Design a protein with these regions (language model features):
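Flexible gly/pro-rich beta->alpha loop and the following alpha-helix that scaffold active-site loops
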Residues: 1-57, 63-76, 81
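Amide-donor transfer/coupling interface in amidating biosynthetic enzymes
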Residues: 2-9, 42-49, 78-136
Length: 136
C-alpha cells in the first residue's frame, strides 16, 4: 500500500537500468513486470498516466520492463502473449555500443520539446538485448 500511495503522489514513474538475478537476461525487467501487474499497483500507474498526465521513463532494463508490461507500445499494462513485442539478444550475440541515427517525428514529450521535427539526430546506443521484435 505504501508503494501505491507513492505512485499516487508522483508525476513520473522511472524504471532504472541495472542488473539482478545473476545478470539473467531481462532479469530486472521480469521483476518490474511481475510487481507492476499487481492490480493495485497497475491501477495506480494507469491513473498516473491517464488521469494525471504523468510520465513514464525506462532506461536499459527499465525500458525492457516498459515493453514487457505493454506500456510500450500499447500505452497500458497488458498480459504478454506469444505475439507480444519484446527486446531480445542482438543478432551478433554480444553487446553493441555505437551511434545510431534517429529521426524525431513528434515532440509530444517533455524530453523532445526542443527537438526539431524531422531532423535526424546521432545518439549513443549501448546494449546486449536491444533487438526489438514484433509481429506484423
Amino acid at each position: 500500500d505504501a508503494f501505491v500511495k507513492a505512485i499516487s503522489l508522483a508525476q513520473i514513474i522511472m524504471f532504472p537500468g541495472g542488473f539482478s538475478a545473476g545478470d539473467e537476461p531481462e532479469g530486472s525487467a521480469k521483476f518490474f513486470a511481475t510487481v507492476f501487474r499487481n492490480e493495485k499497483i497497475k491501477e495506480s500507474v494507469m491513473k498516473l498516466l491517464n488521469e494525471r498526465d504523468g510520465l513514464a521513463l525506462g532506461i536499459c532494463n527499465g525500458f525492457q520492463a516498459l515493453v514487457k508490461l505493454g506500456l510500450v507500445p500499447y500505452g497500458e499494462i497488458v498480459n504478454q502473449t506469444e505475439d507480444s513485442p519484446t527486446l531480445t539478444m542482438n543478432e551478433i550475440g554480444r553487446h553493441v555500443s555505437t551511434m545510431v541515427y534517429t529521426k524525431v517525428v513528434t515532440n509530444k514529450s517533455p524530453w523532445l520539446r526542443k527537438a526539431v521535427l524531422d531532423q535526424i539526430y546521432a545518439i549513443p546506443a549501448s546494449h546486449g538485448e536491444g533487438r526489438f521484435v514484433a509481429s506484423k
